[in-house]
Amino acid sequence: MGGVKCGKSFIGQQVIFDSEHPENIEIGDYCAITMRCILLTHYVIPRGSYHDYEYGKIKIGNNVFLGANTVITKSVTIGDNVIVGAGSIVTKDIPSNEIWAGVPARFIKKYN
């Protein structure tokens, strides 16, 4: 987890943090990042004989639950008090107090 900014949170087994720029990942307090989640802060874009990279930060608020095998892509902010269902792929920001799931992840309902 070298470089990842992480509060008082649970990190499950086999979680993968982007090794290129782990400093671009921030996790708040009281989160559960469960087994085999992947947090990616960059994409590789093939351009003929070379590759371009696109980078972005991932910010996860407080009291967030990421179900097993969830993928968070670059440039995503997840608010406070959020649940993301297992196996979801999160490609856009999630506001506070919501439940999201699916591929790609989509709004399910408000979370009180």
Predicted region positions:
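Hydrophobic beta-strand core residues of beta-sandwich domains
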Residues: 4-6, 60, 78, 94
